[in-house]
Amino acid sequence: MNSKFILSLCAASVITISGCTTVAEMAGADSSTLNVAAAQGFNKTVQEASANKTLDTSSATYKRINAVFLRLKPYADQVNQTGQKFSWQLAVLKSDQVNAYVAPGGKVVFYTGIVNKLNLTDAEIAAVMGHEMVHALEEHSKNKIGAQALTDLALNIGLSAAGENVGQLGAAAAQLGAQ
């Protein structure tokens, strides 16, 4: 066996054992850092929505979403095992988009379209809200960053093992496949 293959096999074994979250932390994506970055991104989203007059802070839809959010927050705090206290925040954006998402640290964004187009009940809003909160609590963004770091590392090891003849087209194709 050649040494590059053995090195690749060892690296793959270590990566597999270490897990995505640990790799994300080794790459500098610890919970605290992610929460700070997410808060900055959330604040930018809120500022832009406010400037564009798409930030909803008073409609009946906003009031329903906010009421559900406020009811669920204490339960989310109780089950938070990330080691970081979340500063839960909600932004409701006026848009026909049928979507909601959460950023690390508990930054929840809801689009009015998900409630209005789907005629969601408060229980259904709670289901969507709870789903988003679980993403934050389970630190799925950190896992995704770790998975991407592992993909990049494996790609680099593979390209190194394949030698210099792979070329940019092969590297670009591999990178597209990783996404």
Question: Which stretches of residues belong to each language-model region?
Answer:
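A Zn2+-metalloprotease active-site environment signal
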Residues: 2-8, 18-179
